[in-house]
Amino acid sequence: MKIRSQVGMVLNLDKCIGCHTCSVTCKNVWTSREGVEYAWFNNVETKPGQGFPTDWENQEKYKGGWIRKINGKLQPRMGNRAMLLGKIFANPHLPGIDDYYEPFDFDYQNLHTAPEGSKSQPIARPRSLITGERMAKIEKGPNWEDDLGGEFDKLAKDKNFDNIQKAMYSQFENTFMMYLPRLCEHCLNPACVATCPSGAIYKREEDGIVLIDQDKCRGWRMCITGCPYKKIYFNWKSGKSEKCIFCYPRIEAGQPTVCSETCVGRIRYLGVLLYDADAIERAASTENEKDLYQRQLDVFLDPNDPKVIEQAIKDGIPLSVIEAAQQSPVYKMAMEWKLALPLHPEYRTLPMVWYVPPLSPIQSAADAGELGSNGILPDVESLRIPVQYLANLLTAGDTKPVLRALKRMLAMRHYKRAETVDGKVDTRALEEVGLTEAQAQEMYRYLAIANYEDRFVVPSSHRELAREAFPEKNGCGFTFGDGCHGSDTKFNLFNSRRIDAIDVTSKTEPHP
């Protein structure tokens, strides 16, 4: 057993209001520059829908993630090394800019410079940020399907409608929707790492964050295809691939990510999970896709177990990280209460950004008396959002974990309503789903109140273990892709626009 630590995230979809604050703040901090105008490290999608980029869940088209071979071994869906090498100069499974959208701005200056004698009111026409030319019509955007925008024929192409009679959901009275914030999953078994020909992508040992070494990256873009969540973007200005860095400078300081910090709905939780690194391959190679969720749970370790603590210390896990794991809200929601579920575990990457399925539309339907009663709790299998749809999204089609999570959330609400409204203790619903009163009270504290100190338990990094950064700063300066060499742009056969270094010139004002 080799114990490692990972900073994971849980998003409570029951409280997401689709305000896109997380997307905007992430965009302003990390990708508001030339070359990645189209890139959104964090975006919020409306489901059902094809998402961003279009149809990203269709792995028959994009070949992302892993497949299990007949001999039980894993292989990237793109193919083995020889097959990857054969596609290195022409990757047929790479999403194009039209699968994302052509980034644009508007000619606002025209509103000020238009001649006064014009017969029509001046307008700000869209202009492409890639070509610089004016656009006749905006065809697409990062949240083009926001709030069920578009006709149902396009929304019905959502892969999560598999095994569902989707025709009935085209009728207005049967319409449903939910918000799905997405970011890099920082997987335990990342396919992007395996498909990178340059070996530029790595997973940090201390916190599990997956990063791209900008010095090693050569812009082959195989990682974009390899990532089944399509959360790696190509910077056409620098010729490098970029992705969500989980705000690691903030994580190292014990602070939450920008998207978590600015979330107005308090839906995001950050915490440490201890896992057995030796069990990753066995878990990801599970034959039945529906068992992948449980196999990933088996990889996680109990931070309160004395044997686990002893082994973690031997493996170099700092005591502060172990203590943070014991207080982790992610561990509580994923392991203790089993409310949080992984996004598309069938990709076999063992994702580490998990989701609590939405309950709000279900609860409102129950209040209106539209549902049959199953004992104390309503029958959650006949609710507005199809349970099979949530299962296709979160548990590879297995409805049992989704039903358990929904019933436990309903039971907690039933218990708290009896306590606050009726002034009595009614534990019948809790007993039906296997929860104690203490667990229900703690669930209420974390899910409903969601205090800052409960949502974010992030240990600061141990700077005493890091090497001195001043010599690196003094020797290398600001470089991208060319190590510690000069700022001259070298010849590049595949991308002449690549920037190897940025010149930083200092200007000194003359003394009077």
Curated annotation (Swiss-Prot):
Catalytic activity from the UniProt record: nitrate + a quinol = a quinone + nitrite + H2O
Binding site for [3Fe-4S] cluster: C196, C217, C223
InterPro entries reported for this sequence: 4Fe4S_Fe-S-bd, Nitr_red_bet_C, Nitr_red_bet_C_sf, NO3_Rdtase_bsu
4Fe-4S ferredoxin-type domain boundaries: 7-35, 175-206, 208-237
Main location (coarse class): membrane
Membrane protein topology class: Peripheral membrane protein
Cofactor(s) named in the record: [4Fe-4S] cluster; [3Fe-4S] cluster
Binding site residues for [4Fe-4S] cluster 1: C16, C19, C22, C263
Record's cofactor remark: Binds 3 [4Fe-4S] clusters per subunit.
Keyword Metal-binding: yes
GO annotation (BP), single: anaerobic respiration
Subcellular localization(s) per the UniProt record: Cell membrane
Enzyme class per UniProt: oxidoreductase
Protein name: Respiratory nitrate reductase 1 beta chain
Organismal lineage: Bacteria, Pseudomonadati, Pseudomonadota, Gammaproteobacteria, Enterobacterales
Gene name as annotated: narH
